[in-house]
Amino acid sequence: MSAPQPKPVRVLLLGGTTEASRMARALAQAGINAVFSYAGRTDTPIPQPLPLRIGGFGGADGLAEYLRAEAITHVIDATHAFAV
């Protein structure tokens, strides 16, 4: 009997800071499957080396649905410490 295969890693990087851009570069360079997400309030998003999404999720339920629909296995919150 073979062991179950682990789910492929897929990361949602919540960004908007210099640190998030650095993390995006590190994830891309490591070949990790990831998506960079800017909040909807972003006027001029900085290009990132990862696929990009812009906008909120519509609350906790919307975020949970996005995580399921996109098969996200890990979330990195690299938003600004005072973001609301």
Predicted regions and their residues:
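Short, structured coil segments at secondary-structure junctions
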Residues: 30, 47-50
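Structural motif
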Residues: 14, 37, 77-78
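N-terminal positively charged helical leader segments and presequences
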Residues: 13, 41, 52, 72-73
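Glycine-rich, highly charged phosphate/nucleotide-binding loops
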Residues: 50-70
